[in-house]
Amino acid sequence: MSERPEHGSHTLRIYSKPGCHLCEIMIEELLPLIRGRLDLEVVDIESRPDWMQDYGTRIPVLEFNAETVCEAKLDVTAIQRIIAQHTSS
């Protein structure tokens, strides 16, 4: 796979592209869960041909610390686990 952009230790990254309905749904469901706890970086896969090749048929792909958390549908349990392990409340 191609090189991933740098991100902070409390940042989720979603690989997406404009007009991706599943991506929009995942972001909409994710934001209330992470607000004030984790950051979200939206990566447009159309900005690089290698990302289009790697993620084009898999989006949305959600990653944390360069590990895939879920694809296509939000895994709420996985997000709750990440929040519990990586944030202080």
Predicted regions and their residues:
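Short, well-ordered coil/turn elements that cap or connect secondary structure elements
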Residues: 35-37, 56
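A structural signal for the main folded, soluble domain(s) of proteins
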Residues: 19-24, 38, 69, 73
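Non-catalytic, surface beta->alpha helical segment in thiol-disulfide oxidoreductase systems
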Residues: 65-89
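Local sequence-structure signature of Cys/Sec-based thiol-disulfide redox active-site neighborhoods
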Residues: 2-32
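Thiol-based oxidoreductase modules, predominantly thioredoxin-like and allied folds used
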Residues: 38-49
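Structural micro-motif
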Residues: 56-62
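Generic recognition of short, well-ordered alpha-helical segments
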Residues: 25-28, 53-54, 74
